[in-house]
Structure formats: C-alpha cells, structure tokens
A protein has these predicted regions:
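Secretory targeting signatures
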Residues: 1-35
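Activation on beta-sandwich/Ig-like modules and their edge loops
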Residues: 22-171
Length: 173
C-alpha cells in the first residue's frame, strides 16, 4: 500500500541521516563546506596516453588491460593540513568540447596531503591525444578550483603530466 511505502522510505531516510551523523563522530574531523580551504585541492597529475603491452606499458587501473583508454586518469591532491570533503564537486575536461563533467561521489574526502585517482572508466572523461585539452575541478557551486592544461600532440606513451605547488607542469614517466 502507498502509505506503508511512504513510511518505510521516510524511516530509511532518517536512518541514513543518523548513520551519517554517527560516522562523523570519528577521530578524523572533516572540514565542513563553509570552513574548508578549497584552494588546497589541486589537479596534481594526469595521464593522457597509456602505452600498450607491446611497449612495456602499465595497467594503471588494474583492470587486466594494458594500454587501454580506460587507463587515462586525473589525480587530485589535498595540499592542505586538514581532510576536505569534495562530494559533488565536478571534474571535467575542456568545457566547450570534450566529455560531460563527472560529479564526484557523495562522501568523497581527500585526507590531508592525500590523493585520489579518478580513471576514465569511472569518470567517462576522455582526455584528447591529438588536440590541446585540460582537466579541471570545480566545487559543488561551480567555482573553478584548479586546472591542468597540455598542448596538442604532446602526449607521450605512459608519460604523465605533473603539476607542482607553483603551477609548473612537467612530464614524468
């Protein structure tokens, strides 16, 4: 009956809310949305072109396929001293062209000086091999937090772009 379903759904919602409140009482305090310094979140590394097994490539996402396009990744780094909740933030490539943005999952927290890696197979963000492209991260309100761009025809096999705190981008393999 419809009334029973409505009561059941309301109870489940309340239980999930209580579960979140209990979880948040652990030793690690998560910076709330209003208090976090979102400028501490940076795109620290991207891999555009994974090398195949024939060329000693790496299976970056451990899915059993070496050099597949699913091995492309974007790495986020929390350069700050407090954990930051990045739930509902948007990861994107070139906004005018390119892939649809990827909304980060609920309850996604990057620990202080911690990293998370988002692979193409889960984000559906396709970084371009031949044309210039960029990766960007925006907060839940759409404010651009950081980006990393690279030029056309510059992606080497199994070589990623790394950005340091000063914003300098270099290639590493």
């Amino acid at each position: 009956n419809g009334t029973t379903l409505a009561i059941l759904l309301s109870a489940l919602f309340l239980m999930s809310t209580l579960g979140t409140a209990i979880t948040m009482e652990e030793d690690t305090e998560i910076m709330p949305a209003a208090g976090r310094d979102s400028s501490d979140i940076r795109i620290s590394e991207i891999l555009v072109s994974a090398s195949s097994e024939d060329y000693n490539g790496t299976d970056w996402n451990n899915d059993g396929y070496t050099g597949s396009s699913s091995d492309q990744f974007i790495e986020l780094w929390n350069s700050g001293s407090e954990p930051i909740d990045v739930s509902n933030w948007l990861l994107d490539d070139s906004p005018e062209e390119g892939s649809a943005p990827c909304r980060l999952a609920w309850n996604t927290t990057i620990e202080a000086d911690g990293y998370i890696v988002i692979f193409r197979d889960s984000s559906r963000i396709e970084l371009d091999y031949f044309d210039p492209d960029s990766a960007s991260i925006s907060d839940a309100n759409g404010n651009l937090i950081d980006s990393l761009s690279y030029p056309a025809e510059d992606s080497w096999w199994d070589t990623s772009y790394v950005k340091d705190l000063s914003g300098t981008v270099t290639k590493v393999s």
